[in-house]
Regions:
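Gly/lys/ser-thr-rich phosphate-binding loops in alpha/beta enzymes
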Residues: 5-17, 156-165, 173
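Surface-exposed loop/turn positions
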Residues: 93, 165, 257-259
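Conserved metal-binding segment of the jelly-roll/cupin
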Residues: 97, 160-179, 186-188
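Short, well-ordered, mixed-charge alpha-helical segments that flank or form enzyme active sites
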Residues: 105-106, 127-132, 138-143, 169-170, ...
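Active-site glycine-rich loop that binds ribose-phosphate moieties when present
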Residues: 138-168
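Fe(II)/2-oxoglutarate
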Residues: 153-156, 181-259
Length: 259
């Protein structure tokens, strides 16, 4: 018999990771940038932490319970591959400027799903910001010139953010999470990221991280899209719709007391 399932978090140390997710680590590790709460990404399958199904992974459960667990429509379409990845992101420093491919390109290049996602700002320090696309419409040549001249930041749309805001990040949108943001992210099951700019920073071993300039160029949406913030009005004990897209629908439920 099914019951409310809990999963062990899958923790990811990052060069930009902070301390706000350290409580999820038994060793209280530092620089944890991501905590994957529910994942079906290959080699990162979530494992149940509670009840009689503890120690079973997500794919094993779907194989047994099928539509009873994920719904008949989802099971018929995806089989045992759970279609969403849900995580927390703690940015103690700016994340790289990046972009994700859509389904068609991801299938062709990586035999994988694309990556459309949404963010909910769990917390944000003063002056925390996000990069959300370009600040005006450009073309590929303009983008490449700015990239090669180390002037990409001049083209990017940087928006200040605050706790409780939500944003939709479709595949093809150049984006980045800024320093001081703690974010809940819901996305397609995909770990494909094309890193296009990383501030020329180096890791603990003095190495710069790999960039994916050639892969990214043909998936970027170069148009000007000013509105990525989700408009919603939260009300106590009522559900507010945040994002509805072909891959997921998200709702926010705010309670007026602890539960």
């Amino acid at each position: 018999m099914l019951y409310p399932l809990k999963f062990h978090p899958i923790l990811k140390k990052k060069i930009w990771g902070g301390e706000r997710l350290a409580y999820k680590s038994e060793e209280h590790e530092e620089s944890i940038g991501e905590s994957w709460e529910i994942s079906a990404v290959e080699d990162n399958i979530s494992v149940v932490s509670n009840g009689i199904l503890a120690d079973n992974d997500l794919q094993e459960l779907i194989e047994v319970y099928m539509g009873d667990l994920v719904g008949d429509h989802i099971y018929e379409k995806f089989g045992i591959e759970f279609p969403l990845l849900i995580k927390y992101i703690d940015a103690n420093d700016d994340l790289s400027i990046q972009v994700h491919p859509d389904d068609e390109t991801a299938k062709e290049r990586h035999n994988a799903y694309g990556k459309t996602e949404m963010w909910y700002i769990v917390d944000a320090e003063k002056d925390a910001s996000l990069v959300l696309g370009f600040n005006h419409e450009i073309d590929k040549a303009t983008y490449l010139q700015a990239l090669h001249q180390n002037k990409l930041m001049d083209l990017l749309n940087v928006q200040k953010v605050k706790k409780g805001e939500s944003f939709f990040i479709p595949a093809g949108l150049v984006h980045a999470i800024g320093k001081g943001c703690l974010i809940a992210e819901i996305q397609q099951t995909s770990d494909i990221t094309y890193r296009i700019y990383d501030y020329n920073r180096k890791d603990a071993n003095g190495n710069t991280r790999e960039l994916h300039t050639d892969l990214a160029t043909d998936v970027i949406n170069y148009s000007y899209q000013p509105q990525h913030r989700v408009n919603y009005t939260p009300q106590d004990n009522q559900s507010a719709k945040l994002v509805k897209c072909p891959y997921f629908t998200t709702n926010l439920l705010v309670f007026d007391r602890d539960i």
